[in-house]
Amino acid sequence: MFFPAIVRRLGILCAISLLAAAILAGWTTVIPARAQELDIELESTGRLMPDVGPGVRAIHRDSKGRYYVLTAPGPSILVYDRDGQLYRHIPKEPSKTTGIVYGLDFDMDSEGDIYVADRGTDTIKMYDSDGRLARSIDVPAPNSIAALPGGEIAVSTTTSRHLITIYDANGNRLRDFGDFVHVTQRPDVNRNVNAGRILTDPSNFIYYAFSYLPEPTVRKYDRTGHAETELSLQTIEFEPEAQARRRYIADQEDNSKPVPLREVINAIGVDPKSGDIWIAIDDELVHYDRDGNRKGLTYRTFTPEGERLVPISILVDPDRLIYACDPAGVYTLPRPDMRPGVAPEKPEEKPAPAPPQKP
């Protein structure tokens, strides 16, 4: 269900206050008109897989409609049927060598093979469609993973000098791409700010969502590393916090201690048919079409009981969104683009041009 966010969010009044503060502060940022619109509450239609809760890391669906869920720590991926009933584990009987120690992310290819980024062993574990461990390759500090055709895998790590590294099925590094955004002079902090998550679509485009960049940003690459589009949310609803984050990071320039960072983008999902992109910033949800045009409003997501939903993974089904939230669990939400009479969905903002790649 959709409800104007009047009680839980001040909406227009808040936007007007922020706009006034921006003007008084002398900001010169151009404020898009959509930033002054009223946010819409998006209420979950119910919970799936009630045994999934704290530690959930990612969710995927196969061609037969089965759902695969990764939790950490946990030795196996949980497999559920279309009705949300658990019926299988991958691997079926995990051992010290075949089990998952601390999986941060996973993906599936078109053949049903599964790839797990296991931070606990600094490896990528590959399971065949029957759930057997096929092979394991060493990758230091894997953070996120996406399966590509021909057995290739795209990986983000916390040690690479690029955003994305492509490996072949045997663990050979094929290519690196994706330049960092320069935010601070401290190399360690700048590397952490550029950490992110990877996702692919059926057309084999690769999406990189910056987890900690002050401005919510997603880049879209083709599988060779050519940058197609960059989506950067620089509206009045996100700009004040982005400015505050940049000031906080700048204040740490002369500090040698580790700098804790708060997540900005916590999840993204891509519609496998349309290529539309859904981006979650805390409990807020925004929508772009495949060409990077902003669609509709900003949505605030809640459980039926009124608790905020902050996803760590988003699955886009034909008629609904599925949120995997740590620790809340897995919830279904209506797709606002399927309810145009209630929550208008229209193209709005054009994407920023993709940044040039360094030779």
Regions found by a protein language model. Give the residues of each.
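Bacterial N-terminal signal peptides that target proteins for export
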Residues: 2-18
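Eukaryotic scaffold repeat domains enriched in small/polar residues
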Residues: 26-359
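Hydrophobic core
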Residues: 18-24
